[in-house]
Curated annotation (Swiss-Prot):
It catalyses: [protein]-peptidylproline (omega=180) = [protein]-peptidylproline (omega=0). The lineage of its organism: Bacteria, Pseudomonadati, Pseudomonadota, Gammaproteobacteria, Pasteurellales. This is Trigger factor. InterPro entries: PPIase_dom_sf, PPIase_FKBP_dom, Trig_fac, Trigger_fac_C, Trigger_fac_C_sf, Trigger_fac_ribosome-bd_bac, Trigger_fac_ribosome-bd_sf, Trigger_fact/SurA_dom_sf. It is an enzyme of class 5 (isomerase). It comes from the Bacteria.
Amino acid sequence: MSLNIETTQGLERRVAITVPTEIVSKAIHEEFKRAAKNVRVDGFRKGHVPAHIIEQRFGASIRQDVLNDLLPRHFFDAVIAEKINIAGRPTFAIETFEEGKDLVFTATFEVYPEVKLQGLENIKVEKPTVEITEADIDKMIDVLRKQQATWAESQDIAKADDRVTIDFVGSVDGEEFEGGKATDFVLFMGQGRMIPGFEEGIVGHKAGEQFDIDVTFPAEYHAENLKGKAAKFAITLKKVENMVLPELTDEFVAKFGPNTKSVADLRAEIRKNMERELKNALVSRVKQQVINGLIEQNPIDVPASVVEEEINVLRNQAAQRFGGNTQQAAQLPRELFEAEATRRVQVGLLFSEVIKSNELKADKERAKAMIADIASAYEQPAEVVEYYSKNKELMNNIRNVVLEEQAVDAVLAKAQVTEKVSSFDEIMNPQA
């Protein structure tokens, strides 16, 4: 077998492969022998069908079967011998496939780029340091109390955190627009669900009042005909309700678990949960900075075929989130996912090189600690640990996550790392 490799463009390669006629003839002969033993033809006993009948009835399909075997087998033999790191699937083009002649074909495929890490010392990472305060716990308790709140009708003016019931009719240039009208609409004030200025226009009014609100739709509003338009809403305020928070009693805290018997227990449980969430958020924030730095310092081309596979993964995930199926996923525009898919492939290749160059292997103790941390969020942590230990797929996922964390640590050891004192809210609600 002879081999000729050429670079077509970027990461695309074309390999011309010649398979000697004796190998082709032997493969065809062996396939005909197998067929002669197994084919059934009316009027002949199994294994006694004449050769010319087999040729006439099955010759074309037998040769196609031989071809389907020879092409990938000799292609992969060739790329393994040449140590080519193939990405995706090859496409084959037959040049010659005739009795008594060499099989000549070409395979077009992509290769993974050669990654040589550089510039790790130029990567800048800001590592937040956070201490959870009693005030942070107080805020979390307030959230829990609001989740259990009741509502009491009020004759006072509407304010933030109230619940109001309204009728409204919206118009632009004196004309009502689609979707701008509602009756008995319940609005939780202060949550920012409506366009800017809408809730603020209700504040200060009482139940029974009718009034107008002037607002402007945001330039990025989803309805094309309303983007940036000035609008007027005629409001009828039908009801104002004040939020009534439950008292922080032992009876209240008992709702949050069998082991929560006092306010002190609740605060301890909240702190534990906040610490776990904070730890995950900090790991994620540092990891994203490392990823951004790696990509910036190591721009690499990625195989289009692998990006396409990742696009399909993202498509299917998006469809599943909204209850769709595979057919619906295929209809989603690839442009929605291309940038994220490309980034994922880049990250995978760069992390693989970090792991390879540092000879990293998943730390068993670190994996155990990660499983224990996950299990601590459940009522029966021992059962969760056992479940993980018996599930190969879950264990592989844990090892991969641990390996990625070790890769991040390896980059951090060479990067420019600075610490910044931050609050719990700054880390957990960065957009607030």
